[in-house]
Amino acid sequence: MGDVAPGAGLARRDFLRVGGMLAAGLSTMPLFGACASIRRPTDFNVEEATIVDIQVAMTAGRLDSESLVQIYLQRIQELDRTGPMLRAVQEINPDAIAIARTLDAERSGRGPRSLLHGIPVLLKDNIATADKMETTAGALALVGARPRQDATIVQRLRQAGAVILGKASMSEWAYFKSTPSSSGWSARSGQSRNPYVLNRTPCGSSSGSAIAVAANLVTASIGTETDGSIICPSGVNGVVGIKPTVGLTSRAGVIPISATQDTVGAFGRTVADATAVLSAMVGVDPRDPATQASGGLTRTDYIQYLEATGLPGARIGVPREGYFGYSPKADALANQAIDVLRQKGAVIVDPVKIPNFDRVTLTAAEITVLLYEFKAGVNAYLAGLAPGAQVRTLDDIIEFNKRNAGDNLPFFGQELLVRAQAKGGLDDPEYLEALEKCRRLGGKEGFDVAMNENRLDAMVAPTTTPAWPIDLVNGDQFRGSSAKSAALAGYPLISVPAGQASGLPVGITFMGRAWSEPTLIKLAYGFEQATKARRPPQYLGTLPV
């Protein structure tokens, strides 16, 4: 094999082979044959490098985690702090180099812990770490507010040997502060940018997590989703995003919006990388009651479902009504993707109707649920902080923003915070009625009916539109996405790059029932391997006329 770019000839068997050898603690010798695609340490090309590329290089002694962290820090300086100024990275973990050095020593002495050993990962800024970093959800009001312990998923990533490189920027309060608003803006970071065309939105609220992976500022990242906050940034930034079933990953230690819709997921440049990160995070957690439902339904390793032959015979539905029609360019690429799925042996059921899918009615019920749950969840999170926080209640946050309006409210208001504060408790009939409507119409009388009547394994649709221009006066020009039914029902999604429209990435989303991650991973991986549609960003200032 010739000297090619990282990631170029590594199929699923390489991923499984390397993972098995790492787990077994075997010597480096059997891996030399897989190393031909890896450059020497002095010219290791981190751009588009996968977890397997990196692990092969590390196992062969051609790279170490400390060097990898240094490479990413240099790229962050060149692309995030200067140059295109992406503003994807909220802050750097001051201990990242020391952690990487310790993990390198452990690798030399005892071998790697997992596929994530020594792999740098960014966390969305609403995921708690009890270290030297802040956890603020992009809000100045939470600067100095210290969590008492790491979020559970952070504990699991650390146990797997991941290097927490830093915190990724995000839409402030996970895009639950005002309407209108601008995705990717926060008082702490300012406006983050889409790396493909810099004056375009990165979407949100997991903006920085997606940007950083797209721009090769980190190997993989963690985000959260309530309704579209992983899937939309994945689509417009040309990366893979996995939004798991609610309860598959713990939300303990995550600044919340919704107890019934929030979930923690992964971003990668490939389905394999995002899947490897997901595998490290799943499992029951006594700190999050929602995970109790996952007992016996989770897998310790989702990598086994990376099957390039996962498409033949799969029944995939196409929900035209409500999921297509808001972007001709996205529709065109989605239709091309559907043709690929059909050519690769999938049985396409087109069209499929999801009953009771009235976006206006569902959104009205959803916002009611979120207002109630946000107030309850944020107050509980703030009450559990260590001493010294400058805010302890949602009302404190609102008043802080009023006192410091120049910094906190320069473009938009905080009407969602105010509306949430006006709500009562979670025993309020208005809340209970709205929640029942969301679950019933989104799931068992909506998405579930379409899946069952058509005997589907999954559905597929455009992820969202190509990225729209950033507008700090009028806010986002959001027209639609694939997230709504899954958000209301708590179901999983995987967005995969499907191509580009005028230089802007477009994704397609695979949608499934609760706990159907194995099926979705098979389908997403099969499509990815058939198309290889991802292209690295070019950092254009604007689109050519």
Predicted regions and their residues:
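Structural helix-boundary/capping segments
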Residues: E78, V163, A214-R320, N335-Q343, ...
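Glycine-rich, small-residue loops and helix-cap segments
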Residues: G61, G118, K124, Q159, ...
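Short helix-loop capping/hinge segments that flank enzyme active sites or metal/cofactor-binding pockets
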Residues: H117-A137, I303-P319, V369-G443, D448, ...
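Short connector loops at secondary-structure junctions
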Residues: A346-A365
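Short, well-ordered alpha-helical
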Residues: G2, V18-V143, W173-Y175, Q292-I303, ...
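N-terminal secretory signal peptides
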Residues: M1-D14
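Short glycine/serine-rich loop/turn segments
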Residues: L116-V264, P289-A293, G317-E321, N454, ...
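Short, well-ordered beta-strand elements within core beta-sheets of diverse protein domains
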Residues: D53-A60, A141-A145, D262-R269, F510-M511
